[in-house]
């Protein structure tokens, strides 16, 4: 059994930090720069799955779905119960339903990321088989086809929206998510263990493709820098390319940044990103009075989220020793 790669946990820590940074409203330039957050998390997931065998697909899909969805549902139950007792906060039925369906629209607005992980996870057995069967040229061609499919799908969405929001969001939050976010995951699968020259070649080609896309966008719109605000919802090829490139750069900088992955605090955060992410959701709202002071707000949200999860973990372990129950594992990890 392969030992846990601490640098992958470091990448997840960086990805989670970038997601939190987006939610505290940093300056526009920084908001755009850090927009590789979710692609980086998918890239790290691909690295973690690289080289693994799935003996039973049904068992894999069931256990992984429970590991992703159960903590989120437990959190949402507690979250909406807490909101119910707040006099100035009225909970709408569509907000509750949308949140439990992990939607981006008509929900609390942060749980769509979990749906991305869930959808990509459901496709993981297929992507693992493809990664093993395709040689480098075939794999590169498949990536290009996926990028084109993401763009064509985005154009299709523009035509679907006037026809009805139900169909639009159903397609947008399933097919478009899978097509787009599978790309960084596939890169993670492919480049966990490769020789340095192949990694450098892939990085160069990815950067070249990104440069071409930026030039095309600039020629068309006169502005190629607002990737997140223009091309993230729904995800388009330019946004996914930037996220994958940034993730690849961080992975290639392992020798330089590897020392950070050995810090116990970062390793702990990287192993427990889900619950820390969930705890940050109410804290984003609670820290809104800080206004434009995004850096103190980020530090406060991060530290309190981590502290709340640490308390939760200690309490769950204490209860487990006295009253073991299978549900407690989802409050722990």
Per-segment meaning from a language model:
Residues 2-5, 53-63, 127-139, 191-203, ...:
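Membrane-interface helix-boundary motifs at transmembrane edges
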Residues 6-53, 68-77:
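Functionally critical transmembrane alpha-helices in membrane proteins and complexes, commonly lining
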Residues 17-24, 76, 144-159, 207-221, ...:
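Aromatic-anchored segments of alpha-helical transmembrane domains
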Residues 35-39, 52-109, 115-120, 207, ...:
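Transmembrane alpha-helical segments and their boundary/interface "anchor" motifs
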Residues 36-44, 111-122, 174-187, 233-246, ...:
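Membrane-embedded alpha-helical segments of multi-pass membrane proteins
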Residues 196-267, 272:
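Alpha-helical transmembrane segments and terminal signal-anchor/GPI-anchor hydrophobic tails
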Residues 254-273, 278-333:
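C-terminal "closing" transmembrane helix and its immediate cytosolic amphipathic cap
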């Amino acid at each position: 059994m392969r030992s846990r790669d601490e640098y992958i946990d470091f990448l997840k820590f960086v990805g989670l930090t970038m997601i939190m940074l987006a939610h505290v409203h940093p300056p526009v330039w920084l908001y755009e720069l850090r927009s590789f957050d979710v692609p980086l998390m998918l890239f790290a997931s691909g690295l973690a799955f690289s080289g693994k065998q799935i003996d039973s697909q049904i068992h894999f899909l069931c256990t992984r779905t429970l590991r992703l969805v159960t903590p989120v549902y437990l959190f949402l139950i507690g979250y909406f119960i807490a909101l119910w007792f707040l006099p100035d906060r009225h909970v709408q039925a569509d907000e509750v339903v949308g949140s439990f369906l992990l939607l981006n629209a008509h929900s609390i607005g942060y749980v769509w990321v979990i749906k991305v992980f869930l959808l990509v996870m459901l496709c993981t057995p297929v992507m693992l088989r493809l990664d093993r069967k395709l040689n480098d040229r075939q794999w590169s061609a498949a990536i290009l086809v996926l990028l084109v499919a993401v763009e064509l799908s985005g154009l299709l969405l523009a035509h679907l929206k006037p026809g009805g929001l139900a169909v639009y969001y159903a397609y947008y939050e399933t097919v478009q998510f899978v097509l787009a976010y599978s790309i960084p995951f596939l890169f993670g699968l492919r480049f966990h263990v490769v020789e340095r020259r192949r990694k450098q070649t892939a990085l160069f080609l990815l950067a070249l493709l990104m440069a071409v896309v930026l030039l095309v966008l600039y020629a068309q719109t006169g502005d190629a820098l607002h990737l997140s605000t223009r091309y993230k919802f729904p995800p388009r090829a330019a946004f996914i390319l930037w996220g994958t490139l940034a993730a690849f750069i961080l992975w290639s900088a392992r020798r330089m940044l590897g020392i950070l992955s050995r810090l116990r605090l970062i390793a702990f955060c990287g192993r427990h990103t889900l619950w820390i992410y969930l705890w940050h959701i109410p804290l984003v709202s609670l820290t809104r009075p800080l206004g434009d002071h995004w850096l103190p707000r980020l530090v406060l949200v991060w530290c309190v989220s981590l502290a709340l999860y640490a308390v939760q973990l200690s309490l769950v372990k204490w209860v487990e020793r006295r009253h073991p129950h299978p549900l407690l594992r989802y409050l722990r990890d």
